Amino acid sequence: MDPSKVKIPPMKDLTVDNITENVIRINSLCQDERLKYVLERLVTHLHDFARETRLSTDEWMTGLRFLTEVGKICSDVRQEYILLSDILGLSILVDSIDHPKPPNSTEGTVLGPFHTHDAEPLTPGASISHDPAGEPLLVVCTVKDTHGNPVSDVKIDIWETDSTGHYDVQYAGRDGPDGRCIMTSDKEGVFWFKAITPVPYPIPHDGPVGKLLKLLGRHPYRPSHMHFMFEKGGFDHLITALYLRNDPYETSDAVFGVKDSLVVDIGKAGPEYAAKYGVSEDHALLTYDFVLVSDEETSELRARNSKEALDKLGRKVKIVNGLPVPDLD
């Protein structure tokens, strides 16, 4: 960039009171309206935070060192930044904003740091876990749209821990995926598989995020759950999970992921399911009916929610590519 050819506003004599407007002014050279808007709001809130808390140099440097340590511990199988976002409630907030749900559809929740891309496609009824110590569980689910129609050929990514509360990627000797798979819904929207009953477990707390939780007086535990991710053209991407009722951490999830509509009971197969799926009548059973939202429904709801929320803040915006930017017309 040649400074002589760019209209850069003069920035001198910067103070506590005028630094924010000057940073925003020079960032306004950005041609990307969305990026410019995001940075304008970020700088505003970041500077207001520093002014409101009277942030000290030592605290500022402590924060920078903390973020450096978060980055250092990240790897292909451990994403500490996702953990940080999770324990601050940002992950669930962003999901709720970007993937709004109409009534009676399945709510989303956090992805977590242990999803992988090497899960293998399995046929209906296959077992996703090879843990002999886990309590066997039959899982039978349906996928429908918001009008009650079955949705076939949905790609469903599923993952859970073993009976000790560890995901496969947490083992140094991992030689392939376990406790995870990819299923596809049939023409009736049904998919079913054999798993083990989920157990509660702590998120990794041997790193900087764990140290932060300890300083805050918070525990690192997540309630018993099983992850699901749904993908099909024409439908909004759904990341969700099912949580077991009466788990000791049901109301204090370290990453704020539990929603009432996602809390389920483990029952028994009984005569009907036992005969149909080849298990004993007292075999543990989990059933759930997932409801996907179309891209069109999601786009309309997201735009409406954005306009309403920002109107309340007195901000005039327009929707561009599904996201709000200032409306200067």
Curated annotation (Swiss-Prot):
Q: Where are the transmembrane segments?
A: none
List the gene name.
hqdA
Q: Which organism is it from?
A: Aspergillus niger (strain ATCC MYA-4892 / CBS 513.88 / FGSC A1513)
Q: What does this protein do?
A: Intradiol ring-cleavage dioxygenase involved in an alternative pathway to the protocatechuic acid pathway since it is active on hydroxyquinol and catechol but not on protocatechuic acid.
- What general EC class does the enzyme of this chain belong to? oxidoreductase
Cofactor requirements of the protein: Fe(3+)
Say which domain of life the source belongs to. Answer: Eukaryota
Entry EC no(s): 1.13.11.1, 1.13.11.37
One GO molecular-function entry: ferric iron binding
Protein's recorded name: Intradiol ring-cleavage dioxygenase hqdA
Which conditions up-regulate this protein?
Answer: Expression is slightly induced in the presence of caffeic acid, p-hydroxybenzoic acid and protocatechuic acid.
> Entry's Pfam families?
Dioxygenase_C, Dioxygenase_N
What does the record's cofactor remark say about binding? Binds 1 Fe(3+) ion per subunit.
